[in-house]
């Protein structure tokens, strides 16, 4: 028996309001009618060429689209359709976006230090380490 999806995207379409050279307004459709379910314990890879909408999908799920974006469809988390406000409340607590480029991290610095900042108090360090443990990032990230 299949588990219920933890994340469900149904008929997601994303477009941007743009202007051409003559300042005529038009909609640039970037994602059209995408449906996706992610169940607990699954690992899902979104693959595609540069500019195909992978990051845009993640931004839509996280509620991080710019002002000129238009979105339709449903994004549900744990069975509940999410509003923009609910996406913002979950962001950084139950949902996070890992950037596609690991070059954002300095390979000569400890990862933990980069994530939390150099002058972190004990509570911040403890919270960061707990999050790393949750995602199976061991102590080597601190070395």
Regions found by a protein language model. Give the residues of each.
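ABC ATPase nucleotide-binding domain
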Residues: 8, 35-37
């Amino acid at each position: 028996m299949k588990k219920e999806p933890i994340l469900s995207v149904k008929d997601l379409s994303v477009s941007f309001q743009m202007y051409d050279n003559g300042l005529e307004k038009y909609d640039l459709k970037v994602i059209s009618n995408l449906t996706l379910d992610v169940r607990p314990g699954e690992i899902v890879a979104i693959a595609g060429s540069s500019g195909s909408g992978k990051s845009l999908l993640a931004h839509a799920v996280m509620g991080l689209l710019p002002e000129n974006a238009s979105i339709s469809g449903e994004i549900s988390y744990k069975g509940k359709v999410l509003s923009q406000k609910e996406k913002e409340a979950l962001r950084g607590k139950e949902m996070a976006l890992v950037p596609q480029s690991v070059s954002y991290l300095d390979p000569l610095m400890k990862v933990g230090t980069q994530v939390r900042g150099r002058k972190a108090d004990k509570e911040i360090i403890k919270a960061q380490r707990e999050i790393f443990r949750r995602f199976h990032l061991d102590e080597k990230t601190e070395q």
